Amino acid sequence: MGHTFNRPDEAAMLRILERHPHSPEGAILRLAWLEGLSRSEITELRWDQVDFEGKAIQLPDRAVPLEPSTEACLRERHVRCALRDPHVVISERSKKPMPPESISRLSRLALDSEGQKVNLMDLRHDFVIRQLQTHDWPYVARVSGMAVSTLRGSFSQYFQERPSAAPELPPDSEYLLWRIVQQEGSSVVGLALWMGWKLQMQPGEILNLT
């Protein structure tokens, strides 16, 4: 049946982001609402995890595509702040990493300016909901870091059914396979798994490439 979540008003969020194009609160809210990062992930995020060329945020358990608004914000902050500290979110005053409490307080002030009674976890949940409205379970599991079973248990009412172009693995199996491919990277095993999974190649076809 799922849960009922406290969701922000989209128009209000866009107004807040427009007022904060590259400030710390602008970065915090974009990372939570547009990228689905938790408060601890925002606190710990470092510049070497932001892949501007690949347009993704590389977290320990997942890679999250960079939304254009987030990319623009982080590019400007990178120019201004990257040489001062390796952390993405730092204080404008001290130029040091913000503790979690300061991140919550700064985001709260920005959200209150538009009467949004939500917190950073609510923004992460809203990210998951929006992803489920346009993508399948395995994809949302990959970008959110949540297991498919957790997503189904909490967010099932938000999933939009779409016709499948081809038979797929059971969602949890596909997510686990994706994790293995991520861990193997460009190794022989990783490439073989990727070719068999995504390109539907047979073992003999893969061997002929070697």
Annotate the PLM regions.
Residues 1-13, 60-69, 82-85, 161-176:
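DNA breakage-rejoining catalytic core of tyrosine-based enzymes
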Residues 7-35, 39, 124, 171-203:
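Basic, Lys/Arg- and aromatic-enriched nucleic-acid-binding interface segment
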Residues 35, 40, 44-74, 208-210:
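Conserved tyrosine-mediated DNA breakage-rejoining catalytic core shared by Y-recombinases
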Residues 43, 104, 129, 152-153, ...:
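Key DNA-contacting residues within the recognition helix of helix-turn-helix
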Residues 44-50, 141-149, 156-157, 196, ...:
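A short, basic/aromatic helix-end/turn motif that makes direct DNA contacts
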Residues 67-116:
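Active-site/catalytic core of tyrosine-dependent DNA strand-transfer enzymes
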Residues 104-146, 160-161, 182-183:
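Short, basic (Lys/Arg/His-rich) helix/loop patches that form interaction surfaces
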